[in-house]
A protein has these predicted regions:
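N-terminal presequence-like segments and the immediate start of the first folded domain
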Residues: 4-85, 89-102, 107-156
C-alpha cells in the first residue's frame, strides 16, 4: 500500500513539473499592434506617428510644423498650437483624447519658453489630472523647431 502511494506521488510530482514547465515556457501572446501614420505629413521619414499596442499608444516625437508650408511658424504660440493639434490628431486616430495621455516629454531649445508653453498646453486638457511630464532642454531640433513632444497614452 505504501509503495502504491509512493508511486502515485512520484507520478503526480512528475506530471506537475511538466505542467508547470509547459505553462511557464510559453511566450505570452503578443498584443495586437496597429501603426498610425498621418497622411500628408511635411516630413517623410522612416517612422510612424504612433504605434498602438493593446490599449497603449506610443507617440513618436513631433514638432510644430505647419502642414501647408512644411515650416515652423514664426510665432511661438502658433508653433505650440500646431504641435498640440498634431498630437490630438494622432490620438484621435487611435480613438483617444489628450486626457488619455499618461506621460509626456517635451524637449525645448530655449527653457525660457517654459512659461509660454504651459498655459497653452493646459488648455488642451478637459481635466486637471494632467499626465506625468518632463520639460527638458535640447540643443537644436529638426526644421528649426523650438519644441519636440513625445508621449504615451493609455485608453481609459
Amino acid at each position: 500500500m505504501n509503495r502504491r502511494i509512493s508511486i502515485v506521488a512520484v507520478v503526480l510530482i512528475v506530471a506537475g513539473v511538466f505542467t508547470v514547465r509547459g505553462v511557464f515556457s510559453q511566450a505570452p501572446p503578443q498584443a495586437a499592434r496597429k501603426v498610425i501614420k498621418l497622411a500628408g505629413g511635411p516630413i517623410s521619414a522612416p517612422f510612424s506617428d504612433a504605434i498602438l499596442a493593446g490599449n497603449t499608444l506610443y507617440l513618436a516625437g513631433r514638432i510644430g510644423i505647419d502642414p501647408k508650408t512644411g515650416k515652423v511658424p514664426e510665432k511661438i504660440e502658433d508653433e505650440i498650437k500646431l504641435l498640440l493639434d498634431g498630437e490630438k490628431e494622432v490620438l484621435a486616430q487611435a480613438g483617444m483624447t489628450m486626457d488619455d495621455l499618461v506621460y509626456v516629454q517635451i524637449a525645448c531649445t530655449d527653457l525660457s519658453l517654459f512659461q509660454k508653453f504651459n498655459p497653452i498646453y493646459a488648455s488642451y486638457f478637459s481635466t486637471k489630472d494632467y499626465p506625468a511630464r518632463e520639460f527638458i532642454g535640447a540643443g537644436s531640433l529638426l526644421a528649426g523647431g523650438h519644441f519636440e513632444l513625445q508621449a504615451i497614452a493609455v485608453r481609459k
